[in-house]
Amino acid sequence: MTDTTGRIPLWMIGTLAGILVISLIGIFFYGSYSGLGSSL
């Protein structure tokens, strides 16, 4: 990657990835706590 101008900033990708991971973990633990995660 020579230049990131005009492309998605790396910090934005990291932020979105972090939010996605936290959301997936939160949903997984919430499902497990609710008893719905047993099917996973």
Curated annotation (Swiss-Prot):
Transmembrane domains' residue ranges: 8-28
UniProt keyword annotation of Membrane present: yes
Topological category with respect to the lipid bilayer: Single-pass membrane protein
Pfam families in the cross-refs: PsbJ
Stored SUPFAM superfamilies: Photosystem II reaction center protein J, PsbJ
Biological process terms in GO annotation: photosynthesis
One cellular component term from this protein's GO annotations in UniProt: photosystem II reaction center
Compartmental location: Plastid membrane
Swiss-Prot/TrEMBL keywords: Membrane, Photosynthesis, Photosystem II, Plastid, Reaction center, Transmembrane, Transmembrane helix
InterPro entries: PSII_PsbJ, PSII_PsbJ_sf
NCBIfam families cross-referenced by the UniProt entry: PRK02565.1 (NF002722)
HAMAP family xrefs: PSII_PsbJ (MF_01305)
PANTHER family tied to this protein: PHOTOSYSTEM II REACTION CENTER PROTEIN J (PTHR34812:SF3)
Protein family membership: Belongs to the PsbJ family.
Record's function text: One of the components of the core complex of photosystem II (PSII). PSII is a light-driven water:plastoquinone oxidoreductase that uses light energy to abstract electrons from H(2)O, generating O(2) and a proton gradient subsequently used for ATP formation. It consists of a core antenna complex that captures photons, and an electron transfer chain that converts photonic excitation into a charge separation.
Assembly notes: PSII is composed of 1 copy each of membrane proteins PsbA, PsbB, PsbC, PsbD, PsbE, PsbF, PsbH, PsbI, PsbJ, PsbK, PsbL, PsbM, PsbT, PsbX, PsbY, PsbZ, Psb30/Ycf12, at least 3 peripheral proteins of the oxygen-evolving complex and a large number of cofactors. It forms dimeric complexes.
Protein name: Photosystem II reaction center protein J
Lineage: Eukaryota, Viridiplantae, Streptophyta, Embryophyta, Tracheophyta
